[in-house]
């Protein structure tokens, strides 16, 4: 069965749950990936650039999860979990946005992991500002959009799937 790369917005607590239980459900069953609608949206750019735009959407969704305000350990660090899932569990939802996909079932395991990206400590202040501004940015406020853009421009550290236990323990 063919597999596709899906970017799952997450939080540090979700990483800890994945390490502890061996599986995790994508919040509300949503993920982001290179979909036909996203490819059609871009008139130029290679596959990697298009995939990066889907990744950025997942990192913005991570900010929305952080905006809920229930993250105790790292309330200002975005997390994106990259997984390779069977095509059969993925349904593109262009009505929700070009890179948006619905996952059924929404659950994935550590075996599906391809990569983990987490904000570095130096990005926390910028991400904190973006978290406060993200809803206002959605309404078109230019200053809020700039704050969110500043956070999206920040480097997220890459971790190999085998580093998950150390990432959870040492951070």
For the regions a language model picked out, list residue spans one by one:
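Short glycine-enriched loop/turn motifs at secondary-structure junctions
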Residues: 1-2, 74
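Alpha-helix initiation/capping motif
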Residues: 11, 34-35, 46, 140-142, ...
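N-terminal interaction modules that seed assembly of large macromolecular complexes
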Residues: 22-66
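Glycine-rich, aromatic-bearing surface loops/beta-hairpins
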Residues: 74-76, 83-171
């Amino acid at each position: 069965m063919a597999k596709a790369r899906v970017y799952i917005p997450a939080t540090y607590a979700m990483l800890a749950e994945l390490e502890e239980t061996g599986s995790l459900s994508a919040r509300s069953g949503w993920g982001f990936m290179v979909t036909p609608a996203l490819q059609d949206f871009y008139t130029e750019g290679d596959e990697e650039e298009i995939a990066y735009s889907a990744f950025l959407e997942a990192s913005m969704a991570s900010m929305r999860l952080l905006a809920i305000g229930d993250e105790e350990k790292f309330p200002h660090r975005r997390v994106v979990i990259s997984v390779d899932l069977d095509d059969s569990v993925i349904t593109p939802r262009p009505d929700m946005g070009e890179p948006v996909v619905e996952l059924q079932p929404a659950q994935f395991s550590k075996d599906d992991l391809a990569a983990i990206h987490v904000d570095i400590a130096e990005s926390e202040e910028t991400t904190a500002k973006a978290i406060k501004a993200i809803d206002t940015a959605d309404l078109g406020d230019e200053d809020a959009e700039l704050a969110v853009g500043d956070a999206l421009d920040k480097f997220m550290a890459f971790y190999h799937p085998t580093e998950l236990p150390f990432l959870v323990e040492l951070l």
